[in-house]
């Protein structure tokens, strides 16, 4: 194992990627290659994220990937020099057990201190920790490292369900319904990419999984990504009617103002949207539907009573004080929706707050 001084020197070199008047770029790159600080035909850049976690950057991983994730990729590629380098820098060698595909690499990991095999719950923990990094690079890597990984074939689906629900919320049942583990995981990474509008990752999955277009639309509706939804709609990749789209926009999470408004512009039934929001206890969505002209208050109250949602019954009982928001009388262009609704607060929720202070805390 190299000395601490050698390890430190390599870290310093990896951190110092600046133009230097006293040394040519070619010679500097030659030094980096000789020190093993080279990946994907380019220098390895070492940096730290906001949580002070070490990150590795290359032209392929421009946003940076966590050190342990970089180790898993190096193991998958059977890149022995980088396996040793990342371990020297503090990567957990046991992460490498996720992506081993040759006995020679397994032997190297053993020599570097890896255990013989991972427990099922350890594989789940590794996935969970890897998901801390929400970037296009990381979602693509998650797909490459985990989706068709034999270690995931016998994973505890109860534990896997918790991870999926952490990111997918009420889409979890739809995702887990009658799908193979590889399809579940592919849709999972794809769904995260859409949820956080990771454009490079969205394009990566779109090019490879054209049969998952409906899933992409479902995620865009559910997670308020109106820009991606509009992109799919204008290219005729949406095969749902307007009310089906509105149902997803209102049911999965609260404050889905952009996708609700988009479906409203397409002609979806705004009263039905309010009923869906009531059924799912999405209070912001209820008030936004009222802003857009929903007025079926008696039916909404009956549904809320049936569900036992007393607070919503109280909200809908004050229908006399509500009125449509005139700001929406002039239609907003789809490309402007996200910007205009970014910090939006429903007018009728503001009225309700003034009338019944303290009853509901949004």
Swiss-Prot record:
<comment type="similarity">
    <text>Belongs to the asfivirus MGF 360 family.</text>
</comment>
<keyword id="KW-0040">ANK repeat</keyword>
<protein>
    <recommendedName>
        <fullName>Protein MGF 360-19R</fullName>
    </recommendedName>
</protein>
<dbReference type="InterPro" id="IPR002595">
    <property type="entry name" value="ASFV_MGF360"/>
</dbReference>
<dbReference type="GO" id="GO:0042330">
    <property type="term" value="P:taxis"/>
</dbReference>
<dbReference type="Pfam" id="PF01671">
    <property type="entry name" value="ASFV_360"/>
</dbReference>
<feature type="repeat" description="ANK">
    <location>
        <begin position="66"/>
        <end position="98"/>
    </location>
</feature>
<comment type="function">
    <text>Plays a role in virus cell tropism, and may be required for efficient virus replication in macrophages.</text>
</comment>
């Amino acid at each position: 194992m190299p000395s601490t001084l050698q390890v430190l020197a390599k870290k310093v070199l990896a951190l110092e990627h600046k133009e230097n008047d006293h040394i040519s770029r070619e010679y500097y790159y030659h030094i980096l290659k000789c020190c093993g600080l080279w990946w994907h035909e380019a220098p390895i850049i070492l940096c730290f994220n906001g949580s002070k976690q070490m990150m590795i950057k290359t032209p392929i991983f421009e946003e940076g990937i966590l050190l342990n994730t970089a180790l898993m990729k190096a193991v998958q590629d059977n890149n022995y020099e980088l396996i040793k380098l990342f371990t020297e820098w503090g990567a957990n060698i046991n992460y490498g057990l996720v992506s081993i595909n040759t006995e020679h690499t397994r032997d190297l990991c053993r020599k570097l201190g890896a255990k013989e095999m991972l427990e099922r719950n350890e594989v789940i923990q590794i996935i969970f920790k890897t998901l801390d990094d929400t970037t296009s690079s990381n979602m693509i890597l998650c797909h490459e490292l985990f989706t068709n990984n034999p270690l995931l074939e016998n994973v505890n689906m109860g534990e896997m369900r918790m991870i999926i629900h952490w990111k997918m919320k009420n889409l979890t049942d739809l995702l887990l319904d009658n799908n193979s583990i590889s399809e579940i995981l592919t849709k999972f990474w794809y769904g995260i990419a859409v949820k956080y509008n990771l454009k490079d990752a969205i394009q990566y999955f779109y090019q490879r999984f054209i049969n998952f277009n409906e899933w992409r639309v479902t995620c865009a509706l559910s997670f308020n990504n109106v820009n991606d939804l509009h992109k799919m709609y204008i290219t005729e990749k949406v095969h749902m009617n307007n009310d089906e789209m509105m149902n997803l926009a209102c049911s999965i999470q609260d404050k889905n103002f952009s996708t609700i408004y988009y479906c409203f512009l397409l002609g979806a039934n705004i009263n039905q949207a309010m009923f869906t929001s009531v059924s799912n206890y999405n209070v912001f969505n209820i008030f936004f539907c009222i802003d857009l002209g929903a007025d079926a208050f008696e039916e909404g109250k009956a549904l809320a009573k049936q569900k036992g949602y007393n607070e919503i019954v109280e909200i809908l009982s004050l229908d006399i004080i509500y009125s449509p928001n005139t700001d929406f009388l002039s239609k907003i262009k789809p490309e402007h929706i996200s910007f205009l609704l970014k910090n939006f607060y429903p007018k009728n929720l503001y009225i309700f707050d003034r009338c019944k202070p303290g009853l509901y805390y949004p």
